[in-house]
Amino acid sequence: MSTTAMWLLLAVVVIVIVFASVLYKRTFTVHELALTGVMAALSLVAYLFFRVPFYGGSSFHLGNTFTALTALLLDGVSGGLAGAIGLALADILAGDPGYAVTTFILKFIIGITCGAVAHKVFKLRELDKHTPGYLAKVIVAAASGLLLNVFTDPFLGYFRNVYIFGQEYTIAKALTKITGGVTFVNSVASTV
């Protein structure tokens, strides 16, 4: 797939997510936009400057930490957008534009999941921070999206490698196993 087609695909994904936000009548305050932008920048910096590249296109990094943190502080959509924008741009700037589309989708899923568990299931905004179990609920909310990524990242990565990059099935399957392990370590490190 050409670079132009990848940019087009990324643009379509962004437009679909923005359109979905409009359908759900989601509006952002200036504070939310500013914090989302700062967290997107922090996730980009955490990926570009503090990562350990690993075989198969994956790497150890703490960029997902800011996705989960934004989802906990604001909401799932803001967290998803912070991680999606920051880490998709990081992929492009790191010279891996082919990964940007799946990164955008995966990080948005992390943010939505963390935010839904934090604010819809546990209702963290309504709880007193000093109540017993508050910290455990925060950790579970953060871990929910990050651990979901352990399954979705290798799954989407397999299809990206086979159908976009044109890899053989056996190679893509082997890389999926490696990616799953690296993603698990990233998830645990980002949760802690």
Task: Explain the meaning of each model-derived region.
Residues 1-192:
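Loop-helix junctions at membrane interfaces
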